Amino acid sequence: MPEITTKPRTKVKPQTERPKLYKVILINDDFTPREFVVTVLKGEFKLSEDQAHRIMITAHRRGVCVVAVFTKDVAETKATRATDAGKAKGYPLLFTTEPEE
């Protein structure tokens, strides 16, 4: 009679990695009106008036400010849409993204 071997069953949960997060960064410029920057921050990033104003002032004083952190696709989409809002009005408003450490 042939010998039957069985393998023990092991349950292994597949490990899913968390998606990398990216920072959306506001770059200060000397031409875009502050009120417009606040409006874009409120509209695209759903910030309160106070939050948007603080981010705008921080970027004005330091040259840059992290607006928010998202997954890569969301961060790039929001940065592009916010930058495009400035371009549509003729302003050099610029948002960039970079990986969060």
From Swiss-Prot:
<comment type="similarity">
    <text>Belongs to the ClpS family.</text>
</comment>
<comment type="function">
    <text>Involved in the modulation of the specificity of the ClpAP-mediated ATP-dependent protein degradation.</text>
</comment>
<dbReference type="InterPro" id="IPR022935">
    <property type="entry name" value="ClpS"/>
</dbReference>
<dbReference type="InterPro" id="IPR014719">
    <property type="entry name" value="Ribosomal_bL12_C/ClpS-like"/>
</dbReference>
<dbReference type="Pfam" id="PF02617">
    <property type="entry name" value="ClpS"/>
</dbReference>
<dbReference type="GO" id="GO:0006508">
    <property type="term" value="P:proteolysis"/>
</dbReference>
<protein>
    <recommendedName>
        <fullName>ATP-dependent Clp protease adapter protein ClpS 2</fullName>
    </recommendedName>
</protein>
<comment type="subunit">
    <text>Binds to the N-terminal domain of the chaperone ClpA.</text>
</comment>
<dbReference type="InterPro" id="IPR003769">
    <property type="entry name" value="ClpS_core"/>
</dbReference>
<dbReference type="GO" id="GO:0030163">
    <property type="term" value="P:protein catabolic process"/>
</dbReference>
